[in-house]
Amino acid sequence: MTRIPPALRGRGAKALLVALPVGLTGSLVALPFTAQAEPSSDAVISEVYGGGGNSGASYTNDFVELGNAATAPLDLGGWSVQYLPGSPTATSKWQVTPLTGAIPAGGTYLVQEAKGSGGDTALPTPDASGTISMSATTGTVALVHSTTPLTCLTAADCAADGTVKDLVGFGTAVVREGSPATGAGNTTSVSRDTKLTDTDNNATDLTGSVPSPHNTAGGGSGDPSPTPTPTPTPTPRPTP
């Protein structure tokens, strides 16, 4: 998610006045100013699933998976995953799940959320746990370098908040990067490709898929193992 440093926000449309030597112009010349983006943390939300425990679901819990595209681990102390309903009102509040530990280099990190009444497959051992009950079809999840609840309720305000390191809106979410991702439901998540592509457009960066939760140890499966079909007992042949 591309960021503008706080000290430079709101200055992109202005210009800097640069004094040139008197021998050249003897006056001030206005030059365009290009805002520099904040360096990427290389951590993104790699998958969101809010259908845990719903009708038809295999997994019992909602979850958020994080991915680290960097070549070094990322310490998540003081970070959080936060959730906002897809169509927030003036009184809507972000719900917070604090994070601990680190995402391995090139690895994943699993955040378990609320448990539903259905499903028969537990998630892999989570790296962090919360109690947020997410919608299966529409909502916004943010990866935040803070444990203080966000206050932004629009895409523009959230984009201007320097603590927001990545943000995924899905379904009909008002708060999103670009357009919201589609394809989420009781039996499907929205997820990034294996390269963790992030172009700041949720609609193209994440697609509907079979839920595939993985923790920092790499444990997990995208397709819960089906119950094996019993082998039929052979019918004895009569003795001649």
Where are these regions (language model features)?
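Activation on beta-sandwich/Ig-like modules and their edge loops
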Residues: 2-17, 26-186, 193-194, 200-202, ...
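Extended alpha-helical scaffold regions
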Residues: 203-207, 211
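Ser/Thr/Gly/Pro-rich low-complexity, disordered linker/stalk segments of secreted
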Residues: 214-240
